[in-house]
């Protein structure tokens, strides 16, 4: 079975990369994994790379950007690059952050591995600080980062003006009553229970979240009821969705697997995923929307 060289110097086989999933017969046959495999084998780093369709077709436009195919390329390239890249051009990159990975580096040697460090290792010519927004370490999902100062400035303005649209999907403990609504709570950092936030209507900053119940389901083959919900945050406070879910003045149902605000019931991860991200491209001014449903 074929193996592939990865950016971190490791060599991984297809069964190792796909894990308990069946390895598709065509996996590794596309041009991008082959080119990256050869580059990493020679200890070369790509400066930039894109895939475009050349020619005419009823299904494709000439010079249309082609993201990695879902079935064959994406799992393979995510392992090779240590980043799940959904889109990249000369100005921006959109990635699917895995749970447990920091968005930006923290204090200490053990907190240097993060999305930013992996992007900078893969694209050495990008700016020193490419991040324009963050996800909690335990949250998975979509992040956009900037390669240039111009792109960083333009995207930052969009986040400040709240013209960026974000949607999350989560599993909440128990059965959430109602079809949807809006949660508005004020909260602040709790110095006595780091890194938790605490409800404080006097000194806290207000956060607003729109939510919609998607379905009620069982979880993990157990007699455990959970509710799948969609969140649209209108503000971007630290731990906003986690606290709005768990607090009795919010939904009163913590996110499954939340080590800070949860019930302690077993779960392999925090069941919170940034599933949709929409913004205006900082150079082309085209409105771009990326969607990726969670694996839970």
Q: Can you describe what each PLM-predicted range is?
A:
Residues 1-296:
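RNA pseudouridine synthases
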């Amino acid at each position: 079975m074929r193996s592939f060289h990865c950016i971190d110097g490791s060599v991984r086989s297809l069964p190792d990369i796909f894990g308990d999933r069946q390895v598709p017969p065509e996996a590794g046959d596309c041009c991008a994994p082959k080119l990256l495999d050869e580059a990493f084998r020679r200890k070369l780093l790509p400066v930039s790379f894109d895939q475009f369709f050349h020619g005419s077709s009823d299904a494709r436009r000439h010079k249309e950007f082609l993201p990695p195919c879902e079935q064959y390329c994406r799992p393979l390239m995510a392992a090779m690059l240590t980043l799940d890249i959904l889109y990249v051009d000369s100005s921006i990159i959109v990635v699917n952050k895995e749970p447990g990975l920091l968005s930006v580096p923290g204090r200490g040697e053990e907190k240097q591995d993060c999305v930013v460090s992996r992007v900078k290792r893969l694209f050495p010519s990008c700016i020193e600080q490419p991040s324009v927004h963050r996800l909690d370490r335990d949250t998975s999902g979509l992040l956009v980062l900037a390669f240039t100062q111009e792109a960083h400035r333009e995207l930052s303005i969009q986040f400040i003006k709240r013209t960026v649209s974000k949607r999350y999907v989560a599993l909440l403990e128990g059965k959430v009553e109602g079809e949807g609504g809006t949660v508005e709570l004020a909260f602040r950092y709790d110095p006595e229970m780091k890194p938790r936030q605490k409800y404080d209507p006097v000194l806290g900053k207000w956060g607003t979240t729109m939510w919609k119940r998607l379905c009620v389901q069982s979880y993990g083959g157990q007699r455990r009821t959970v509710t799948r919900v969609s969140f649209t945050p209108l503000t971007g406070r630290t731990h906003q969705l986690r606290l709005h879910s768990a607090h009795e003045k919010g939904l009163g149902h913590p996110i499954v697997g939340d080590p800070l605000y949860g019930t302690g019931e077993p779960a392999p991860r925090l069941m919170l995923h940034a599933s949709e991200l929409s913004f205006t491209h900082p150079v082309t001014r085209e409105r771009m929307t990326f969607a990726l449903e969670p694996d839970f």
